[in-house]
Amino acid sequence: MAAGPIRVVLVLLGVLSVCAASGHGSVAEREAGGEAEWAEPWDGAVFRPPSALGAVGVTRSSGTPRPGREEAGDLPVLLWWSPGLFPHFPGDSERIECARGACVASRNRRALRDSRTRALLFYGTDFRASAAPLPRLAHQSWALLHEESPLNNFLLSHGPGIRLFNLTSTFSRHSDYPLSLQWLPGTAYLRRPVPPPMERAEWRRRGYAPLLYLQSHCDVPADRDRYVRELMRHIPVDSYGKCLQNRELPTARLQDTATATTEDPELLAFLSRYKFHLALENAICNDYMTEKLWRPMHLGAVPVYRGSPSVRDWMPNNHSVILIDDFESPQKLAEFIDFLDKNDEEYMKYLAYKQPGGITNQFLLDSLKHREWGVNDPLLPNYLNGFECFVCDYELARLDAEKAHAASPGDSPVFEPHIAQPSHMDCPVPTPGFGNVEEIPENDSWKEMWLQDYWQGLDQGEALTAMIHNNETEQTKFWDYLHEIFMKRQHL
């Protein structure tokens, strides 16, 4: 992970690339009533939402300054705690205008004990229970931004870990500021035309498989390689990347793993030749959906998907994805793919959503329409600044409620703090990609790594919760608490 100053420079440099790459798709789509065609980013830049560690904007959200809070010294402070993550440049503090009023966003940790600091904002990948700011002050909320894979921090997948936070912004629709569709810029992205059938037929005649697998992140909690390895016994799979590789991408530039998650035109042209894409997420959580799902649909391929158990809720219609878990075995899945590969009429039914009026899922349409943040859209805030304002508005409401209660306790109740719930991550214990966990040897690398990591996250969450309840001030005591919890669990 890059050092803090480098990451801040990346934040600034990314602003221009985000704006430059976003001018065609979503804006044109709104002007044409949602029916515009998607235009690829002119420079082949990566399609992804502005990363918390990469490209973010610095535009302020609009809002009307509230009377009596004009001076920055009177405004509530939001303290970004994760090193290098601060969606403003330059300086350490920035006044932000939000819907309910103004706050001051800061990254200066010296503000931690200031009475005006009302909220700490944490980035989930960086959050470490052993380094949490203690003691936790009663007047401060903790806010969590975690749009990335749960494998980065399994502490957050357990009740004791997620309930440390008051406000959340995660991939789950149940979080306070949901980012479920962070990888989907709009409906126009899904409507990209399907490649000519003759082009794909020629590709097959040249000996290529019907099914593509492109992964370089191996040995993940979802254990996807174990399933794909078994599937390969029943149907040809062209596997690129570092995982189960049996073919190489045509150029060294495309072989670079940094290119594999981009909208590079040459890469997209190559991938679009395949009728089916194996799309397996690195972890299984409700609403956790990445480019592995949306990019094949963009390219006119059928995703063969395993990931979010709730994925059907988000699909453009009820016949646009093949779900691995609908089949009792890899062999049965292979037989079905082979059937579709040989029956164009049945295959094309999976791409009907690309036709005018083909996107019939009103929940998907409404979710895209009503989200207040955009994906590479200069007319909308990115989700970092959006969540920041969400926290600001919450703190302003909390301040008003506290003042009202102080002035008239009988008429205004005590403000009840909001507490995050396990559904805000919703990630169960990892299971094998194929077979039963009891059948896997104890020295299997997946079993040794991910099962242990998952349950250690529970212990860490319980340890930090106990430290907060005991009003501990020394972070070094965390390991004593963790050891005590571990020993108690061993004797259960």
Curated annotation (Swiss-Prot):
Family matches, as Gene3D superfamilies? Glycosyl transferase family 10, C-terminal domain
Q: Which GO terms describe its biological process?
A: fucosylation; N-glycan fucosylation; positive regulation of protein secretion
Membrane-related topology note = Single-pass type II membrane protein
Cytoplasmic topological domain ranges are: 1-7
Record topological domains on the Lumenal side:
25-492
Q: Which Pfam families match?
A: Glyco_tran_10_N, Glyco_transf_10
Q: Which residues form a coiled coil?
A: none
The UniProt record lists the EC number as: 2.4.1.221, 2.4.1.-
Entry GO terms, CC: endoplasmic reticulum; endoplasmic reticulum membrane; Golgi membrane
Q: Sorted alphabetically, which SUPFAM superfamilies does this protein's record hold?
A: UDP-Glycosyltransferase/glycogen phosphorylase
Q: What GO MF terms are annotated?
A: alpha-(1->3)-fucosyltransferase activity; fucosyltransferase activity; peptide-O-fucosyltransferase activity
Glycosylation site residues: 166, 443
Q: InterPro entries this protein is in?
A: Alpha-1_3-FUT_met, Glyco_tran_10_C, Glyco_tran_10_N, Glyco_trans_10, GT10-like_C_sf
Q: In which pathway does it act?
A: Protein modification; protein glycosylation
Q: Which residues cross the membrane?
A: 8-24
Does the entry annotate any disulfide bonds, and if so which pairs?
389-392
Glycosyltransferase: present as a keyword of the record? yes
Cite the entry's keywords alphabetically: Disulfide bond, Endoplasmic reticulum, Glycoprotein, Glycosyltransferase, Membrane, Signal-anchor, Transferase, Transmembrane, Transmembrane helix
Q: What is its main location?
A: endoplasmic reticulum
Which compartment or compartments is the protein found in?
Endoplasmic reticulum membrane
Catalysed transformations (reactions): L-threonyl-[protein] + GDP-beta-L-fucose = 3-O-(alpha-L-fucosyl)-L-threonyl-[protein] + GDP + H(+); L-seryl-[protein] + GDP-beta-L-fucose = 3-O-(alpha-L-fucosyl)-L-seryl-[protein] + GDP + H(+)
Its function, per the record, reads: Protein O-fucosyltransferase that specifically catalyzes O-fucosylation of serine or threonine residues in EMI domains of target proteins, such as MMRN1, MMRN2 and EMID1. Attaches fucose through an O-glycosidic linkage. O-fucosylation of EMI domain-containing proteins may be required for facilitating protein folding and secretion. Also shows minor alpha-(1,3)-fucosyltransferase activity toward activity toward biantennary N-glycan acceptors. However, this was tested with a library of synthetic substrates and this activity is unsure in vivo.
Return the similarity comment: Belongs to the glycosyltransferase 10 family.
In Swiss-Prot or TrEMBL terms, this protein is called: GDP-fucose protein O-fucosyltransferase 4
Q: In which organism is this protein found?
A: Homo sapiens
Provide the gene name from the record: FUT11
